[in-house]
Every structure is written in structure tokens, then in C-alpha cells.
Amino acid sequence: MKHFLRALKRCSVAVATVAIAVVGLQPVTASAAPNPVVGGTRAAQGEFPFMVRLSMGCGGALYAQDIVLTAAHCVSGSGNNTSITATGGVVDLQSSSAVKVRSTKVLQAPGYNGTGKDWALIKLAQPINQPTLKIATTTAYNQGTFTVAGWGANREGGSQQRYLLKANVPFVSDAACRSAYGNELVANEEICAGYPDTGGVDTCQGDSGGPMFRKDNADEWIQVGIVSWGYGCARPGYPGVYTEVSTFASAIASAARTL
């Protein structure tokens, strides 16, 4: 989920997730959802083969074919865990071609307490035979325009989606993001993206844990963020907040070696 209130984590159920929201540009009150989707596009089959849907209502990406990188707020701790089902290989969650694999272990970021450090790894019982998504190890790619994708809600308060949706969101500076969230932003662990002036494009409930990514210098996808939280979905003045993957790249690699 994406946080709604940390400002909220972007979850679809008890733990968080986020979805692509492309909504009307008017302000939203706590009691009123924005207009239905007015933009955004459905991803093509095979366009983002590393995308994974998790049964608790979050997204994720294949760090390895048998390890999913997601958000810490999507899981309830570390240890053996066979309760999560990962679905991969499709954009249509109802497709007969969907690959469904159970989890065996979960590793939540050490020291996670609800603020910052919002990453986790899920070990799968068997590999999902799809390309993986490499992660950024430096801040060199923490700029420009990013892609986000997910099966989460397409409007604030909306339902989860059958088909994978995608959108582009531009980098938002720490200063601009801090003007929206103040001390809630952990600037050395988080990266912001979106349209703070107008709103209208964002991740939303059900996309939490999914990747924010862009092309690297070799024209290959590289993950720079993990969907974490934001105030509502696509509201003017409030960009999305993502775990800054490069900050935790070494810790993620070390943790993966233990699974």
C-alpha cells in the first residue's frame, strides 16, 4: 500500500499497497474521492515482465527470479512465511497464463518502525521465469522522469485493478517534497515524484511495494524507488513518496544472500 496517513501508506488491505491514479485535478476532501480515471494507460503484456502482484494487496518486483523486493509496510515481520502468493508473468491477473508461487520466507528491513527503511524481501518456493529488475546502487538515476506501474486503485478510494496500469511521474526535489510533508519526509531514505503543482497522476492504494523505475545509460530498466506513501492519491500539493533504493542497495543485497 501507499501510506495515506503516515500520510497514508498505500495499501489495499490491512498492510499497504498502491495503484496508479490518474484523476481529476480538483482538490479532494477527506470525505470525497476524486473523479474517476481520466488518463493513464494499460501496460502491454511483457512490457514490464519483472512486475509481481502479492496476495496481501501489494506490488513488488523480481529482485531475483525467486526473490521479490517490496515494501516493509506490506509484511508483518521477518521469518518463515508461506501465506503470501506472488503472481507474475501477466498483466491480466485473471489470465490462465499467470504464474502463482507461494512464499517461504520474509525479511523485513532491520529496524523498520513505520518511518523510513520501507523495504522487504520475499523468498519464493520456486522461481518465476521472468526477467528481473536491477536496482540502483548510486543516486545517479534519482532524477528525470520515472515509470510507475501497479494493479492498485485507479482513483482514491477505488477498487483494485485486474489489468496492470502504468504512468510516468517526474522527480520532485527534497525541498519541494518537504514543503508538502514537513518532518514526515525522511529525505536521506526517501525520494519523491509526481505533480505537486497540479496533482492528477500518482500511485494509490494497492500499489505499495511496487517499483518506480527508469532507463539507465545502457537503455535498461533500473529500479530507483519502492512505492511507500503519500497524502491521498494524486492530490495537488502532495507528490508520492518512495523508498530510495540506492540508499539501501547494499543492505538489500546482503539480505538477499541470506534467503
Curated annotation (Swiss-Prot):
<keyword id="KW-0645">Protease</keyword>
<feature type="disulfide bond">
    <location>
        <begin position="58"/>
        <end position="74"/>
    </location>
</feature>
<keyword id="KW-0732">Signal</keyword>
<feature type="disulfide bond">
    <location>
        <begin position="177"/>
        <end position="192"/>
    </location>
</feature>
<feature type="active site" description="Charge relay system">
    <location>
        <position position="73"/>
    </location>
</feature>
<comment type="similarity">
    <text>Belongs to the peptidase S1 family.</text>
</comment>
<dbReference type="InterPro" id="IPR001254">
    <property type="entry name" value="Trypsin_dom"/>
</dbReference>
<dbReference type="GO" id="GO:0006508">
    <property type="term" value="P:proteolysis"/>
</dbReference>
<feature type="active site" description="Charge relay system">
    <location>
        <position position="208"/>
    </location>
</feature>
<feature type="site" description="Required for specificity">
    <location>
        <position position="202"/>
    </location>
</feature>
<dbReference type="InterPro" id="IPR018114">
    <property type="entry name" value="TRYPSIN_HIS"/>
</dbReference>
<dbReference type="Pfam" id="PF00089">
    <property type="entry name" value="Trypsin"/>
</dbReference>
<feature type="propeptide" description="Activation peptide">
    <location>
        <begin position="33"/>
        <end position="36"/>
    </location>
</feature>
<feature type="disulfide bond">
    <location>
        <begin position="204"/>
        <end position="233"/>
    </location>
</feature>
<dbReference type="InterPro" id="IPR001314">
    <property type="entry name" value="Peptidase_S1A"/>
</dbReference>
<dbReference type="GO" id="GO:0004252">
    <property type="term" value="F:serine-type endopeptidase activity"/>
</dbReference>
<dbReference type="InterPro" id="IPR009003">
    <property type="entry name" value="Peptidase_S1_PA"/>
</dbReference>
<feature type="signal peptide">
    <location>
        <begin position="1"/>
        <end position="32"/>
    </location>
</feature>
<dbReference type="InterPro" id="IPR043504">
    <property type="entry name" value="Peptidase_S1_PA_chymotrypsin"/>
</dbReference>
<dbReference type="InterPro" id="IPR033116">
    <property type="entry name" value="TRYPSIN_SER"/>
</dbReference>
<keyword id="KW-0865">Zymogen</keyword>
<protein>
    <recommendedName>
        <fullName>Trypsin</fullName>
        <ecNumber>3.4.21.4</ecNumber>
    </recommendedName>
</protein>
<feature type="domain" description="Peptidase S1">
    <location>
        <begin position="37"/>
        <end position="257"/>
    </location>
</feature>
<keyword id="KW-0378">Hydrolase</keyword>
<keyword id="KW-1015">Disulfide bond</keyword>
<feature type="active site" description="Charge relay system">
    <location>
        <position position="118"/>
    </location>
</feature>
<keyword id="KW-0720">Serine protease</keyword>
